[in-house]
Design a protein with these regions (language model features):
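Internal alpha/beta core interface subdomains
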Residues: 24, 28-114
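Active-site glycine-rich loop that binds ribose-phosphate moieties when present
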Residues: 15-23
Length: 114
C-alpha cells in the first residue's frame, strides 16, 4: 500500500521521493499495489497535480522532516534546490499499471497527508 504525492483526475499517479524507496516499490517487486489517495491530493490535470506535489506536498513534508532546504524554511513552493537534504530527487508518473503488476487506486474522501 502506497500513498501518492498527487493524482490527476485524468488518471496519472505522481510520486516524488528522496531516496527512491517509495518510487521503486511502485514499479517493481510486488504482484499487486494499492495506491491510497486522499481528496486533497487530487487535481484536475496532470500539470496541476505535478505542481501541487512539488509546491504543496513536498515543502510540507520537508518541514515535517526538519530539513534545511529553501522549501522547508519558507514553506511556500519548490525552489528546485541542490541541497544535500533535498527530499525530491526522484519523480515517477504512472499513466497505467506497470506490466505484470496489478494496481488499484483507492480514493478516500478525506484529506490525507500533504
Amino acid at each position: 500500500m502506497l500513498f501518492r504525492s498527487g493524482m490527476a483526475e485524468t488518471g496519472e499517479l505522481i510520486n516524488i521521493d528522496g531516496n527512491g524507496n517509495r518510487v521503486a516499490s511502485s514499479l517493481y517487486g510486488h504482484k499487486k499495489v494499492w495506491f491510497i489517495v486522499g481528496r486533497n491530493k487530487l487535481a484536475p490535470t496532470y500539470e496541476e497535480a505535478l505542481w501541487r506535489a512539488r509546491n504543496i506536498a513536498a515543502p510540507k513534508n520537508a518541514q515535517r522532516l526538519g530539513r534545511k532546504t529553501p522549501c522547508a524554511v519558507h514553506g511556500d513552493r519548490c525552489y528546485d534546490c541542490k541541497s544535500p537534504e533535498r527530499i525530491c530527487r526522484g519523480l515517477v508518473v504512472l499513466w497505467e499499471a506497470v506490466a505484470n503488476m496489478e494496481m488499484e487506486v483507492v480514493l478516500i474522501d478525506q484529506d490525507l497527508g500533504y
